[in-house]
Swiss-Prot record:
Organism for this UniProt entry: Stenotrophomonas maltophilia (strain K279a)
Gene3D superfamilies: Vaccinia Virus protein VP39 (3.40.50.150)
InterPro entries named in the record: SAM-dependent_MTases_sf, UbiE/COQ5_MeTrFase, UbiE/COQ5_MeTrFase_CS
Annotated protein name in UniProt: Ubiquinone/menaquinone biosynthesis C-methyltransferase UbiE
Keywords, ordered alphabetically: Menaquinone biosynthesis, Methyltransferase, S-adenosyl-L-methionine, Transferase, Ubiquinone biosynthesis
Family: Belongs to the class I-like SAM-binding methyltransferase superfamily. MenG/UbiE family.
Record has Methyltransferase as a keyword: yes
Transmembrane parts of this sequence: none
Chemical reaction(s) catalysed: a 2-demethylmenaquinol + S-adenosyl-L-methionine = a menaquinol + S-adenosyl-L-homocysteine + H(+); a 2-methoxy-6-(all-trans-polyprenyl)benzene-1,4-diol + S-adenosyl-L-methionine = a 5-methoxy-2-methyl-3-(all-trans-polyprenyl)benzene-1,4-diol + S-adenosyl-L-homocysteine + H(+)
Binding of S-adenosyl-L-methionine, residues: T76, D97, N125, A126
Protein origin, superkingdom: Bacteria
Free-text function comment from the UniProt entry: Methyltransferase required for the conversion of demethylmenaquinol (DMKH2) to menaquinol (MKH2) and the conversion of 2-polyprenyl-6-methoxy-1,4-benzoquinol (DDMQH2) to 2-polyprenyl-3-methyl-6-methoxy-1,4-benzoquinol (DMQH2).
Amino acid sequence: MSESPYKAGTTHFGFRDVAAKDKQKLVGQVFTSVARNYDLMNDLMSLGVHRAWKRYYVATAQVKPGDRVLDLAGGTGDIAALLKERVGAEGSVVLGDINAGMLSVGRDRLTNRGLVLGLDYVQCNAEALPFLDNSFDLVTIAFGLRNVTDKDAGLREMYRVLKVGGQARVLEFSEVTADWFKPIYDFHSFKILPKLGKLFANDSDSYQYLAESIRKHPPQDELKAMMGQAGFERCHYKNLTGGIVSIHSGYKL
């Protein structure tokens, strides 16, 4: 495994090399730009399949009524809403996001759906979470880890705030496993997606970054190893839709 570019003082922002200290601001600008069209963005990036991926992700999580759950990079709240159904009236979900605009959209959408009790919203950096050790039964992050500057630090923080016996889950765009599909996927990502972003959201640059960020994200086996290095045990992953996305799971034992 190559040395983390973060440790060298630089990291990637899409295909660009930038100072690690600047990535958080740059990513923040992207998500402030796309916050109101975030679900549209995911529809364009996944051709609408992200909704099924998210339902499966939550349905297969280790969570039960009464549990306390942390959903990082919670965005517009769709994962948090599904998790709240699983933990029930006695359970609680904390929706955490570093971006105030995304957090506001999530709060408004869930409130408009009548989802108020047992939901909290915290603006936080995944690399330095403002929670006590052993606070949550389940920690999730969906389509957010690739935007974290120091992914190793983010994984260590997920481990720290997880209760013993708890599970961490990562849903993320990943490395396509079928060679024949890779050229098609690249064409959609780099030729079609930015144009759709320009057409529907008047923002091609943000969509270009998001496509590039997927290619820079660690492939499945590397992310599994990173989770193990962060302290998680029984780490494994499951590819969905030919590896377009994968679900990584690990436990604090």
